[in-house]
Amino acid sequence: MVSERRFFKRAADRFVTIRRRRLHHKNKGAAWEDAMLDTPSQSAEDVRLQSFSVTYEYPVVFTRDAFALGNRCLVDALSRREPCKRHRCLICVDEGVLASLPDLASQIENYAAAHAGSIDVVGLVPVAGGEICKNDPKTIPNLLEILSQRAIDRHSFVIAVGGGAVLDAVGYASTIFHRGVRHIRFPTTVLAQDDSGVGVKNAVNLFGLKNLIGTFAPPWAIINDSAFVDVLPPREKRAGMAEAVKVALIRDGKFFEWLEAHSDALARFSRPHLDHLIKGCAELHMRQIRLGGDPFEIGSARPLDFGHWSAHKLEQLTKNQLNHGEAVAIGIALDTRYSVLSGRLAAGEDDRVVGLLQRLGFDLWHDKLRQCDSRGLPVVLKGLADFREHLGGELTVTLLAAVGRGVEVHEMDDRIVRNCIDWLEQRA
């Protein structure tokens, strides 16, 4: 085997040879292509650099009562590139959503009938909601079997209606079936509408690790229907607020100030305020994906994962007794305190952040933060190693330089983390 250094040296030598020949032939009027063809190869390697880019475009729609007969959001999404076609659709619906909205299935059927010129529904499939569907090893094979049985092809649509876990599982199955079929998301939780549902990731859990297998594949469209939020229990409405606090802290100080000013209304789940939170949070996540320079996370930085290294571990340690938003709220508090103790964030800003989270109704302590390993170290610290492995490359954690401005760091001091845990316990 040729060593990596030797390989690149040969490639560089070949480039120099071609460059010299190009200059020589240019004086004689010879074409560059001729010089390329005439250049004798001095090695067995022949290197070609392939480069191309792909532009993605998908609408994110904010609406209400998307399956009302007069609402054209879904029809328009299906038809935006092929307006005169009848589109084959398989619809997968979160079982929890079907239980909360018993008339939803008939509404979908009536909607499809009213727009039969554009929609051909070939099935409505219930899918177990929550982390159950991401943990169950049968979920993806079962979905793939259904896609095959219903003759879904690369011009068909798979429509997922549900919380973030269902969107993740159905999205993953869709993106690996036939190397990717078109999928449309209907997020039904605050967490999915303002964060995960507007992104480009799909994943399920494996070997006890969160999102271990998955894909980066933008959806065809996202339709955020505020009517789904109305029927959520308070705990689920609150969970999505953690992601709004997170993205405000790392990207938009003005949005954080708005959250502070309206925390009482948000804690009461005022519909106008909750709608504003969802839109503001979703737009900031979309901006990061669009302008952050790394939508498919090829590098090591994950600014949108502020507070998540410990959150993912807490979800695992509590066997999902903490939902994602509750774990993220604790993670935000932990990393904000760390930002202060490490000298990056002004003193007192941690109190400000924790105060907002508590006014929104979050409990910022769980006894699993105190669970230690055989060396006496908090088990939650293992979340840093898991986080680095999931990201690849060097450890990169987002902390705060100011409210509204995140900063990347590449190491975390165990002693400071333990001090942060002590601080949270004292405030519990």
What are the language-model segments listed below?
Residues 52, 61, 68, 172-265:
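A glycine/threonine-rich phosphate-anchoring loop and its flanking beta-alpha core
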Residues 150-173, 177-188:
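A short, small-residue-rich loop immediately preceding and capping a beta-strand
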Residues 10, 14, 22-25, 35:
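Short, low-complexity intrinsically disordered segments enriched in A/P/G/S/L with frequent Arg
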Residues 44-45, 53, 242-245, 344-428:
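C-terminal charged capping/lid subdomain of soluble metabolic enzymes
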Residues 262-378:
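Active-site segments that bind and position negatively charged phosphate/pyrophosphate groups
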Residues 37-156:
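ATP/NTP phosphate-donor binding region
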